[in-house]
Amino acid sequence: MNVDSRVFRFFLVFLILVVVASPGCVDNQPEPGNTSAGEGEVLTVFHAGSLSVPFEELEAEFEAQHPGVDVQREAAGSAQSVRKITELGKKADVLASADYALIPSLMVPEYADWYAAFARNQMILAYTNESKYGDEINTDNWYEILRRPDVRYGFSNPNDDPAGYRSQMVTQLAESYYNDDMIYDDLMLANTGMTLTTEENGTALIHVPASEEISPNTSKIMLRSMEVELSSALETGEIDYLYIYRSVAEQHGFEYVALPPAIDLSSLEYADNYSKVQVEMVNGEVVTGSPIVYGVTIPNNAENSELATEFVALLLGETGQQIFIENGQPPIVPAIAEGKDSMPEELQALVV
């Protein structure tokens, strides 16, 4: 991550503190209206799997406002979505990531000129009424439940999906919170090909090998490319527990263990604590623990930037905010932009 993006991360935390305290400040901002522009065209949207439900609703609303326009969405792990553009040369009109930092670190300046932070989330441990020991598990003992030999849990591939590397961060942070220095060893190191080293400054650095070398112990762990692919496994009882975002758990009606704010990557108050763990993906990219913030951009290779601008305006405006609230995911109001001067003018009024 370059210096500019590190500076943006600092100001992002500061600005979220300011704007969350005044959520009504965009009441008078313009909303995208009905238009015939783009009739008969296709709008391609790459987005995080955890955005599938709210983006399905955004798609329906956008298509209602734009008769004849077909919104085609591709859900994937956010890192994988970015690589479709940067490595595979695929074209997208909108890119929405579960970790905004992937945009400055992997896309700017060649593939994108700006990005906006628009929503937050938190990590939880989801389960169902059929999960083993579901009547026992709580915030204080969840890691002990996962240690039991007959319990199977799932998380997404850290190389592909922010929920995957955030699952590793949460588990490592749990060691200091619960004063148990074997939690990560027992749950992750003993059951996968991942390794861990401790830096001189005390930061825990988790190393993720090539995806085929993660080699999970399948009697304990189910690994998939993105976290929402594991939801059906939880529903059918193939796994007992799933590291996932709170919004996804609520959208699917799962029970869940709310993790302590000190480790669930949701709270600005604990940002310094989150930064004590890093994850190095197989491509060498190192991600530092931080509060969960989603980001959106219009890639430079967008084939329909006009419609993309209107879609992002819908996302960032009051309609999009309400959709996210109803789906259990707090919007950032107003959205916070980096590279604002490079944004389409229609979007500049919706961000700070």
Curated annotation (Swiss-Prot):
The keyword Signal applies. GO terms for molecular function: molybdate ion binding; tungstate binding. Disulfide bonds: none annotated. Keywords: Signal. InterPro entries: ABC_trnspt_W-bd_WtpA, ModA/WtpA. Residues 1-21 form the signal peptide. GO terms for biological process: molybdate ion transport. It comes from the Archaea. Belongs to the bacterial solute-binding protein 1 family. WtpA subfamily. This is Uncharacterized solute-binding protein MA_0280. It comes from Methanosarcina acetivorans (strain ATCC 35395 / DSM 2834 / JCM 12185 / C2A). The lineage of its organism: Archaea, Methanobacteriati, Methanobacteriota, Stenosarchaea group, Methanomicrobia.
